[in-house]
């Protein structure tokens, strides 16, 4: 019934080492994570030479034995991406996983929802995912798909999202934007090297958004500063800081009618449960990172980094949930945690102010390259410390009335007179780890071997601050990979990685409410091929299998009717295809497809086996192309297609959201006014105004349905001053 995510218990350490690429010359300078080159989809720029973040270290895209995708600044600008859900629509391996409008959003990679405590990173360091992640200060977004045990330690097995910040440069840009709803957007990007050894980059954005959902308009202010300081001939210090404040009413998700039927005749502009007294959800976030590097020689480098991330959420919502108080559910024949068969739903006055999440991290690392006979080594080793805390006040979560999904106007009810209680520590987690990885090169082969030893100490507390759980675990997480350079254009690889994540919490409607299940070990095997047919195009294919113990609410004879258990295995087997770069001098393409089979077996509940798991479509595809018109210099036509197969919405697989295709289109025009470049972007998402369910994800054990946005046009213009 709680509309919020439960306090995230997965608390992992920083990204692991990114070792030197052994195939590079011995005197090649090492690049820092914040200097990773994005895969640019434009002519004359080799797409395959970009180093990228991955669990197996830094190297060119072709030599990385993992599925990694980079969404660069050019693509983010062309698609006018502003939210995490919009970001996910650009990669077929990603999908929404409880992503309401007006609230912080979460996504899934390869069918596994990310942990909001450890799955999102800025410049390689974990940040609190319980924030509205801004993109104005981001140069590229790196998507590591699959297990990242060495890179992140204790975490969900789907992967990680790494936001790479902009570095100081000579730039002065102003962007103005609006959309078909009347939103107003302004952003500035200013950079300058104040001296040959010290540079700054300042980004800011102010947004007043008019949402397509009634009564859900919002605002956002964002500020960031990045500095680079070259210390002597061998040292460098990079510091990044950003702050954002936002306020917007959160839109509740729909639920199945009577637990068996999708809602029909849904108006996407309707705000479920709207009450005039409902305040917006306020989210204030601060993120700080610092990295110091020192080159002992051309082959050895030390790296010391630290980060701090804080998110404060004032959670206020008239929350639409279940039908416990509705007449259609009074006899108990319909589960109370779903909407009633006729569309009735209960409204709760939910308030949880000062919900505070903090991440603090420190890491020391040594990277080096050396030879032993005919074998070249690129070694990385180090240690890190990660701490995470969650402080929350006792919330108000009171029933105030019942409405129906087809009400033209939601009935108004009086709010609860209760007030939130005092703040108390809910989670205190610490993770200490040591790691090492060696990339050994011999002829056309590379063997990567390493691991991470992690020790976790975590305490959870109830609403009053009374201890209720103390978890301790120590695990070694090995990983290895073999890369074969078949030709100058083709590399093939096979990899094996082990990971660990903490157990889930039993939902309130199960017989063991609030119980945390044991930590789960996961295993992943992946085989891939990467093909670089030219200097500006990359093609990739990856076949993977990831498995972990299955944790779920099992039907039984208890008074609650369900008990949350760990039984059987959950296995995700899939094929991913990617293409990125220039098909011709005028045509660029970013495309991906995912074919995923996610099943449970030996779970002890036959109805829950033999079919796709919830919120994991079997097939996803996304295509975005841009064609430069030959008869108008600087004018490009953009087009996109997004597809998802039917999406299971119940544990027994009997109800699914239908498959959908969505088409996007746009224009991009670059010209100059005097000596100043100007770029216009016009994009139309969901061109044919298709209705579809974009998300059947869960929060606190309950499942929700979120409709996709209707047709929306966006216009922006960027002036280089």
Model region roles, listed by residue range:
Residues 25, 444, 545-547, 565-651, ...:
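Gram-negative outer-membrane beta-barrel transporters
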Residues 136-139, 150-225, 231-236, 286, ...:
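Outer-membrane beta-barrel translocator/receptor signature
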Residues 293-295, 301-307, 311-319, 492-496, ...:
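Membrane-embedded beta-barrel scaffold of Gram-negative outer-membrane proteins
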């Amino acid at each position: 019934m709680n509309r919020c995510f439960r306090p995230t218990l997965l608390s992992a350490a920083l990204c692991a080492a990114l070792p030197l690429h052994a195939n590079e010359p011995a005197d090649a300078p090492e690049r820092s994570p914040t200097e990773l080159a994005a895969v640019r989809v434009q002519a004359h720029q080799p797409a395959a030479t970009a180093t990228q973040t991955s669990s197996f270290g830094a190297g060119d895209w072709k030599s990385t034995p993992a599925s990694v995708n980079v969404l660069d600044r050019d693509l983010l600008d062309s698609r006018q991406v502003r939210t995490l859900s919009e970001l996910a629509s650009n990669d077929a391996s990603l999908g929404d996983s409880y992503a309401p409008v007006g609230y912080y959003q979460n996504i899934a990679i390869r069918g596994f929802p990310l942990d909001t405590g450890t799955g999102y990173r800025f410049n390689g360091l974990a940040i609190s995912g319980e924030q509205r992640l801004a993109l104005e200060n981001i140069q590229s977004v790196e998507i590591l798909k699959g297990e990242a045990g060495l890179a992140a330690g204790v975490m969900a097995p789907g992967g990680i999202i790494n936001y790479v910040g902009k570095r100081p440069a000579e730039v002065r840009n102003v962007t103005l934007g609006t959309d078909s709803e009347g939103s107003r957007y302004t952003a500035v990007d200013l950079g300058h090297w104040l001296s040959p050894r010290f540079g700054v980059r300042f980004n800011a954005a102010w947004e007043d958004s008019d949402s397509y959902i009634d009564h859900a308009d919002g605002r956002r202010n964002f500020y960031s500063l990045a500095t680079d300081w070259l210390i002597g001939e061998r040292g460098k210090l990079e510091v990044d800081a950003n702050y954002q404040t936002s306020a917007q009413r959160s839109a509740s998700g729909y639920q199945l009618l009577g637990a068996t039927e999708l809602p029909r005749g849904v108006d996407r502009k309707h705000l479920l449960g709207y009450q005039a007294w409902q305040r917006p959800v306020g989210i204030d976030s601060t993120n700080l990172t610092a990295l110091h590097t020192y080159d002992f020689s051309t082959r050895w480098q030390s790296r010391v980094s630290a980060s701090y991330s804080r998110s404060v959420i004032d959670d206020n919502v008239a929350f639409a949930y279940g039908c416990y108080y509705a007449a259609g559910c009074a006899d108990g024949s319909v589960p109370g945690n779903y909407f009633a068969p006729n569309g009735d739903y209960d409204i709760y006055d939910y308030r949880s102010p000062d919900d505070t999440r903090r991440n603090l991290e420190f890491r020391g690392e040594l990277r080096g390259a050396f030879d032993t006979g005919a074998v070249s080594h690129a070694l990385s080793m180090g240690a890190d410390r990660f701490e995470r805390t969650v402080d929350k006040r006792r919330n108000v979560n009171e029933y105030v009335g019942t409405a129906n999904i087809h009400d033209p106007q939601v009935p108004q009810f009086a709010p609860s007179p209760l007030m939130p209680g005092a703040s108390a520590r809910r989670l205190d987690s610490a993770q200490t780890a040591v790691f090492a990885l060696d990339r050994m090169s011999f002829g056309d082969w590379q063997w990567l071997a390493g691991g991470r030893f992690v020790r976790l100490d975590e305490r959870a507390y109830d609403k009053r601050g009374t201890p209720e759980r103390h978890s301790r675990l120590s695990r070694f997480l090995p990983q290895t990979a073999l890369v074969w350079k078949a030709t100058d254009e083709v590399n093939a690889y096979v990899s094996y990685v082990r990971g660990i994540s903490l157990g889930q919490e039993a939902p309130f409607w199960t017989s063991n409410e609030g119980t945390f299940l044991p930590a789960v070990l996961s295993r992943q095997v992946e085989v891939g091929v990467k093909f670089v047919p030219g200097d500006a195009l990359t093609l990739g294919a990856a076949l993977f299998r990831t498995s972990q113990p299955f944790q779920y609410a099992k039907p039984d004879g208890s008074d609650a009717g369900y008990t949350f258990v760990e039984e059987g295995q959950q296995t995700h087997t899939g094929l991913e295809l990617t293409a990125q770069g220039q098909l011709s001098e005028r045509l660029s393409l970013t495309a991906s497809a995912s074919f995923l089979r996610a099943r449970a077996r030996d779970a002890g509940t036959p109805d829950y086996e033999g079919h796709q798991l919830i919120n994991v479509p079997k097939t996803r595809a996304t295509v975005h192309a841009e064609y430069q018109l030959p008869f108008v210099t600087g004018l490009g036509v953009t087009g996109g297609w997004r597809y998802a197969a039917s999406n299971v919405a119940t544990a027994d697989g009997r109800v699914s959201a239908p498959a959908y295709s969505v088409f996007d289109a746009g224009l991009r025009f670059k010209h100059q006014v005097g000596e100043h470049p100007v770029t216009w972007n016009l994009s139309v998402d969901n061109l044919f105004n298709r209705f579809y369910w974009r998300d059947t994800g869960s929060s606190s054990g309950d499942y929700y349905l979120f409709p996709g946005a209707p047709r929306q046009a966006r216009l922006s213009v960027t002036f280089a001053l």
